Amino acid sequence: MLDLKRIRTDFDTVAAKLKNRGVSEDTLTHLKELDEKRRTLLVQSEELKAERNIASAAIAQAKRQKEDATQQIADMQKVSADIKTIDNQLVAIDQQVTDIITVLPNTPHDSVPVGADEEDNVEIRRWGTPRDFDFEVKAHWDLGEDLDILDWERGAKVTGARFLFYKNLGARLERALYNFMLDEHIKEGYQEIITPYMVNHDSMFGTGQYPKFKEDTFELADTNFVLIPTAEVPLTNYYRGEILDGKELPIYFTAMSPSFRSEAGSAGRDTRGLIRLHQFHKVEMVKFAKPEESYQELEKMTANAENILQKLGLPYRVISLCTGDMGFSAAKTYDLEVWIPAQNTYREISSCSNTEDFQARRAQIRYRDEADGKVKLLHTLNGSGLAVGRTVAAILENYQNEDGSVTIPEVLRPYMGGETVISPK
């Protein structure tokens, strides 16, 4: 959530930055006018309360002296009525301010490229060379069926579209991947966490999914619970409402969890395969950092995600998302896109973001600065390290062989009991 004081004191800068994120200046102008009216009413309310206190003292004095206080009482009743009217106006204005400010996206960092959509994203670097196949490559969904490791038909029967069963070495590959990912992140100083897979509405507000993106989630009817769309939500909200010791920062968390997404608005896109599912495993990284260190931590986090792809030998590129393509809470985002041979393109497999103090303000996560003893908002960061199903897809396609088998990447073999290849039965 943005700082209302910042909007008030640096309106033009905030308006210019949010314009690049599709926010109309009229919206901010209306917010500023509401804030000004609110501040004026607060002054009036305080003045009237002071007047009421004086009148109350005068009435008490008159009664002690057995004087007639009828007029003073009438005057005080009018003042009290005026205060109530103003207080009611303030409640209404506060709600309007909340309704606006809670759906405003974060302001982009100055280094973020300005653009409207993914066409304006900027490629930063590439790693690895896509393999030159001398046979016709298969899509991962066909490989999965031929190898009897992915069962889409029964997934649809048991649940519905965009669900599947992992079987045999497919299940072992999925498990090997997330264990490998977690182990690599732990080596980099991340604390492993097993989170709840349901969170309450306050947690969804804290990380920015609510109220704006409710339609993208699965809520449990007649409860305050939501299935997590990412482990970012419980990991970040772990410290919601707390003041941390500045000496302990930065703090690194990692977790593997299922992610549940309704994929509202995705009808017709990626209807086959592992790219877009309603339920998938993801290894998440979350950091809590001091403001002056958060962008250095973003680079480290991105490198942690890249490390996984490099050790798996999967070609990828790093993209800096433009202002029009970033997520709601992000101030800056790097996407990692892995090479998918059957589609002859790169597809997103990780997204690493610095939200600065946007989530921390919503969730009230602060730290006490050891230098001056002041309590300040910290910065939160989050990143995929990695989306496991998409990594399975990338391995199946990049490591496929002409005979229909798939070679298991070397780093995963110890996690798969020494298996080296997945072969057709």
Curated annotation (Swiss-Prot):
<dbReference type="Pfam" id="PF02403">
    <property type="entry name" value="Seryl_tRNA_N"/>
</dbReference>
<protein>
    <recommendedName>
        <fullName>Serine--tRNA ligase</fullName>
        <ecNumber>6.1.1.11</ecNumber>
    </recommendedName>
</protein>
<dbReference type="InterPro" id="IPR042103">
    <property type="entry name" value="SerRS_1_N_sf"/>
</dbReference>
<keyword id="KW-0648">Protein biosynthesis</keyword>
<dbReference type="InterPro" id="IPR033729">
    <property type="entry name" value="SerRS_core"/>
</dbReference>
<dbReference type="InterPro" id="IPR006195">
    <property type="entry name" value="aa-tRNA-synth_II"/>
</dbReference>
<dbReference type="GO" id="GO:0006434">
    <property type="term" value="P:seryl-tRNA aminoacylation"/>
</dbReference>
<dbReference type="GO" id="GO:0016740">
    <property type="term" value="F:transferase activity"/>
</dbReference>
<feature type="binding site">
    <location>
        <position position="284"/>
    </location>
    <ligand>
        <name>L-serine</name>
    </ligand>
</feature>
<keyword id="KW-0963">Cytoplasm</keyword>
<keyword id="KW-0436">Ligase</keyword>
<comment type="similarity">
    <text>Belongs to the class-II aminoacyl-tRNA synthetase family. Type-1 seryl-tRNA synthetase subfamily.</text>
</comment>
<keyword id="KW-0067">ATP-binding</keyword>
<dbReference type="GO" id="GO:0140096">
    <property type="term" value="F:catalytic activity, acting on a protein"/>
</dbReference>
<dbReference type="GO" id="GO:0004828">
    <property type="term" value="F:serine-tRNA ligase activity"/>
</dbReference>
<comment type="function">
    <text>Catalyzes the attachment of serine to tRNA(Ser). Is also able to aminoacylate tRNA(Sec) with serine, to form the misacylated tRNA L-seryl-tRNA(Sec), which will be further converted into selenocysteinyl-tRNA(Sec).</text>
</comment>
<dbReference type="Pfam" id="PF00587">
    <property type="entry name" value="tRNA-synt_2b"/>
</dbReference>
<dbReference type="InterPro" id="IPR002317">
    <property type="entry name" value="Ser-tRNA-ligase_type_1"/>
</dbReference>
<keyword id="KW-0030">Aminoacyl-tRNA synthetase</keyword>
<dbReference type="InterPro" id="IPR002314">
    <property type="entry name" value="aa-tRNA-synt_IIb"/>
</dbReference>
<dbReference type="InterPro" id="IPR010978">
    <property type="entry name" value="tRNA-bd_arm"/>
</dbReference>
<feature type="binding site">
    <location>
        <begin position="348"/>
        <end position="351"/>
    </location>
    <ligand>
        <name>ATP</name>
    </ligand>
</feature>
<dbReference type="InterPro" id="IPR015866">
    <property type="entry name" value="Ser-tRNA-synth_1_N"/>
</dbReference>
<feature type="binding site">
    <location>
        <begin position="230"/>
        <end position="232"/>
    </location>
    <ligand>
        <name>L-serine</name>
    </ligand>
</feature>
<feature type="binding site">
    <location>
        <begin position="261"/>
        <end position="263"/>
    </location>
    <ligand>
        <name>ATP</name>
    </ligand>
</feature>
<dbReference type="GO" id="GO:0016260">
    <property type="term" value="P:selenocysteine biosynthetic process"/>
</dbReference>
<dbReference type="GO" id="GO:0005737">
    <property type="term" value="C:cytoplasm"/>
</dbReference>
<comment type="subunit">
    <text>Homodimer. The tRNA molecule binds across the dimer.</text>
</comment>
<comment type="pathway">
    <text>Aminoacyl-tRNA biosynthesis; selenocysteinyl-tRNA(Sec) biosynthesis; L-seryl-tRNA(Sec) from L-serine and tRNA(Sec): step 1/1.</text>
</comment>
<dbReference type="GO" id="GO:0005524">
    <property type="term" value="F:ATP binding"/>
</dbReference>
<dbReference type="InterPro" id="IPR045864">
    <property type="entry name" value="aa-tRNA-synth_II/BPL/LPL"/>
</dbReference>
<feature type="binding site">
    <location>
        <position position="384"/>
    </location>
    <ligand>
        <name>L-serine</name>
    </ligand>
</feature>
<keyword id="KW-0547">Nucleotide-binding</keyword>
